[in-house]
Amino acid sequence: MCMNRFFTENRKRGFAYRLKQSTFNTQYVDIIVDSKEPRYYLAIECKSLKGKRLSFSSNFHKDKDGVHQIDNISGFISYTGRRGFLAAEFRGGPKNEAYLMPWELVLEYFDSAASIPIEAFRECVVLERITGGYRLPAGLPEE
């Protein structure tokens, strides 16, 4: 996993784990990262998509009560005190591209647009493609 590789390579203390999806349990985000460093105490939602835009209507869902996934994730981030990120992998071009976008920026787009273009992701944290996955080359920006 990208974050665990980062912790190992940079001799930092932290651990990332993917939450299993279940029909009967609520899963707020895909990856939880625990670390004593607040910078790496994270909640990460992952999206893998074809195309050049991430759509809030087709790439996210509403729960049985009609609450949008963005709102549920935002509540989880606020309640737990974690830093939120959206990991987006864009597939189908000459090469796959992946990025981490801070959750605050995701919310800005959610409040003002129907989708987020790939160009906006390219201005965020770039994940380097390596054999078997991705690598976080430089760490995360301070809050």
Regions found by a protein language model. Give the residues of each.
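Histidine- and/or cysteine-centered catalytic micro-motif in compact active-site loops
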Residues: 21-22, 36, 46-49, 89-91
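Mg2+/Mn2+-dependent nuclease catalytic core
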Residues: 49-72
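Conserved catalytic cores of phosphodiester-cleaving nucleases, focusing on short active-site segments
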Residues: 31-33, 40-52
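Nucleic-acid nuclease catalytic cores
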Residues: 74-106
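Short, solvent-exposed loop/turn segments that connect beta-strands within catalytic domains
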Residues: 36-40, 93-96
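Acidic-basic catalytic patches of nuclease active cores, encompassing PD-(D/E)XK
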Residues: 1-24, 36-37
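Beta-rich catalytic cores
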Residues: 27
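Helix-rich interaction surfaces within compact, conserved domain-sized segments
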Residues: 1-12, 99-143
